[in-house]
Amino acid sequence: MAKEARQLNILLVDELPERSLAMEKLLTNLGHKIVARASAGDDLSEIVSRNLPDIIIIDMDSPDRDTLEHMQTISSDRPRPIVMFTNDDDSETIRKAVRAGVTAYVVDGLQPQRVVPILETAIARFNEFQNIRQELESTRNTLEERKLVERAKGILMKQSDYDEETAYKAMQKIAMNRNMKLVDLARSIIAAAELLK
């Protein structure tokens, strides 16, 4: 038994009005809502900010540079799944589209029976990518915090003639007594050492 798909709020971008109407009819018949329509030349970033669609669907013969730049901006500022239906199967264009944040790049246009699986796949892929991106950011932050703590520990070892373990325990004790995070104390130690240079 197939599960019922949730209603998606969609930004529909299309170069041709008659094709846009056909796509809109198909999507609304599937239970989705078109929250905005645009053409490739419109300021897509602003339209996304104003309408907050769940997903962006672009139907065009070949993505132009401006459209790809808009996709890059959207992917940076307000990430969301982007599905592009196109006739352009050039591998360089595909690479540029994926780098710009396109989640699903579908060549040979739109076939009604494929829409639901394509949208579901694009959303799942987008969510997985966002999870990976968040994990990477968290790992980067943890690594940066460790570097700061190590640097501050080195400063204490040099200035107070502590060994590594004693310096670390001293930092932990001070942070606990001041109700601070260890990394915030490390930043303070580094800043103070910079002032005393």
Give the label of every model feature segment:
Residues 79-89:
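A short, hydrophobic beta-strand element within the central beta-sheet of small alpha/beta folds
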